[in-house]
Amino acid sequence: MQREPLSPENDALWRRLWEIWQDNDEEDVVLDSLILDELEDEIPELRDRTKTALAYLQRARYIQYRSGVGEDGLEPILFDVYEPR
């Protein structure tokens, strides 16, 4: 499967999501506001654009997530991340 190349910030997000998902033994991960804030601190270019970047990564077939109800309302739930090479 050929995927389009990612911008540096989207690539950094994808690789970080892979680490988070692996640390959770490939189980679903709720990306609550705390995790999203941490990601924005780690990747400042994504500030206020993290959810847009998640949607892009899903459309480009790098990750899979769904929306679910969490403590802060609707939150993305990461359930698959394709391994970075």
PLM regions with names:
Residues 6, 28, 46:
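Residue-level marker of regulatory loop/turn positions in helix-turn-helix DNA-binding domains and
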Residues 12, 34, 52-53:
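Amphipathic alpha-helical interaction segments
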Residues 1-25:
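Short alpha-helical segments that sit at the start of domains
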Residues 68-85:
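Short, cationic-aromatic polyanion-contact patches
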Residues 58-68:
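A short, conserved structural fragment
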